[in-house]
Amino acid sequence: TSDGSLLFLQHLISKMEPDGSRIGIVFNGSPLFTGDAGGGESEIRKWIIENDWLETIVQLPDRMFFNTGITTYLWIVTNKKSSKRKGKIQLINGTSFFKSMRKNLGAKGKEISKENQQEIIKAYLNFEENEISQIHENTFFCYTKVVVEQPLIEDGDIKTNKDGNPKPD
């Protein structure tokens, strides 16, 4: 993998208690979006989803950290989902739950107030679809990479390899 975040999450998962544990970890967008199907990152995400450990992802406001303005995500991972959460992943849009700081601290210009925290926690605990919460079956996040190739054409002829199969363009 090109990003160690998912490797670290694998390590945390390996430390979960068999009777049930919950992990909360903040990531940038990289663990969500990097890696082609069949690649390292994609395979780790697949492993987490197939084992039904990913419970919730909360998209946090940007500009929450001192040294960067990037958007971050709170992942909640557990090996003991409640029956209503089994086979499902909740996505919470927490980007509007912040208060602006009077004075920026580097790139940090926003913070989540206690009231904002309670709104996000309420969305998590209610586990209902609404304007900030989506609930999807685990299979919603599975995909297969498909590559469509065109044959290599030179001077109007399809070029073939030694086996007689068309060479890809």
What do the PLM-derived regions correspond to, one by one?
Residues T1-D169:
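A conserved structural/catalytic subdomain of Rossmann-like adenosyl-cofactor enzymes
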